[in-house]
């Protein structure tokens, strides 16, 4: 590897916002985020890959540091013998993928000698470059877990620090390198790309992929090839996915596309603002675009949604109220009214074990008690047949079944750190942990294509806690996974769609806030990834999650209500983020530090108020109507008069932060009723029924 000096040459690829998650050396529990620029250059018939800190005046004392147990890090030391070993150790680390979306805290790097490190030391420590002829392989992260990262391994077994592409597009780098070398998947690990040989013919024929007019423009210097390729890549996505078109419109991708056609001189071939507005209008239906004279800015004004209504919540549905709505054969009467009451106030804990089976679809709402008894017998037999499948596999068989072996390994690691502070799962050899493990292993037999993905234990834990029964917990979990399945698929299409939909809703509510996030490289809302992936499981206390999930399971007041919950949380934090001028790292840090500090009743009030505000809007964009499942500006809204009992206590929703310049305050009157004293948790966890 060559010294990381200044390199000149023809730039083939260039990407800013490529981070190294550095190590602190003597401080073993912290990691830093160093933003840099990655380039691929041609020089004297040699191809050079070069990374260096983005700011030439980099002062490592200003770097923010994260705990190592909460971020994805491949450590890089100066000793060559250690580099290969440590790199391999971290690459195979279970933490490296899941914890990319689990960063919880950052710290300033302390100086061991009391002096700030010099600019030269900080820069030379992390800058690197190498010739493509020295490249042995490229390790890719598992797709879907936050932003992508790549790790370069050289032929002398030196493993370079992982490069994290916070802004995406790591695939463009791979495509650029494939012009010069052949990259093939490793037979042992499909995420590892092996460098086989030089491939100059690919480079020579690359221009033929473009049509002749475009090639002529490139040769004449009127068209930036890199920008054109970027535009073509994303234009294909626009045609395939209208939601992607919406997101790209929000990100002002059109400026970049048309800039590639204008050439390097911004004063020539300037596209009229009116045409840009027309393009964005098509890409973002329902939003009005105003072009300002100031170049480079498009102001997308939000539609006047009108006054936001005041929302009230009620007490949790009691066992007595539930019983009154059951007929002599055990059928639930007036299901819609029951769902409305649950949405308004949740359920008392004594009722959850029974009601959750209906909310999750395990029991049909119109089933009789006898039919449910028969169903449970059938499901019990089915469960144990599947459980026997993995229980009966011998060690010799498992040695030849790498997928099952990998599933078991992930499950064991996840189970051992899932809700261990909860009395239900604390201690060694806890029956709750054993059941958690067995249910997840059985789910691998139930859906072997999906198997187990990190994070699924977070979804199962509250279900097992409430059901206290292995079979019932499994089938409730299977039903919940039917809803959440796309979140955990390898392509992560469900997560991508939700992030795009969330951006659409947030821009409608406050385009100014969205523009600020975009200016801080946070426009794709990746800091909400964990919220969506496991439905806020790590953002609220365990008891609050029980309340939040049962409210969401009613599917009221609209489709994708969880996205409005995200909007409500971001709305509450908007003022602090903008007034303190938070950048990318500060936004990520701030959002993660909200964990366990969010008032669930306050957020439910705000989210419902937002939904009612949108329903009453006569100019609601069609894209938003589709996201929320609204037809003709109509939605199934919970009746404010639900609960005829005069003793029902209603709590007012705090004023929206969008409607006031003051920081939002949590209402003391909105106290939750599911305090630890009201939800009995027996110290004798052996009351679980493993069946």
From Swiss-Prot:
Q: Does the keyword RNA-binding apply?
A: no
Phosphoserine PTM positions read 23, 70, 205, 274, 640, 675
Q: In which tissues is it expressed?
A: Ubiquitous.
Q: Name one GO cellular component term.
A: extracellular region
Which InterPro entries does this chain map to? Rab-GAP-TBC_dom, Rab-GAP_TBC_sf, SGSM1/2_RBD
Q: Which GO terms describe its biological process?
A: regulation of GTPase activity
Which Pfam families would you find in this protein's record? Answer: PH_RBD, RabGAP-TBC
Keyword tags: Acetylation, Cytoplasm, GTPase activation, Phosphoprotein
Is Glycoprotein among the key words of this record?
A: no
Entry's localization field:
Cytoplasm
> What is the superkingdom listed in this entry's lineage?
Eukaryota
Query: Where does the protein principally reside?
Result: cytoplasm
Gene Ontology MF terms: GTPase activator activity
Q: Which residues form the Rab-GAP TBC domain?
A: 346-556
PROSITE patterns to which the protein is assigned, alphabetical: TBC_RABGAP
Transmembrane stretches in the record are: none
Which parts of the sequence carry Phosphothreonine?
A: 689
Instruction: Report the residues modified as N-acetylalanine.
Output: 2
Q: What does this protein do?
A: Acts as a GTPase activating protein for RAB7A. Does not act on RAB4, RAB5 or RAB6.
Could you give the subunit structure recorded for this chain? Interacts with non-phosphorylated form of RAB8A; phosphorylation of RAB8A at 'Thr-72' disrupts this interaction. Interacts with ARMC12.
The name on file for this protein is TBC1 domain family member 15
UniProt organism field: Homo sapiens
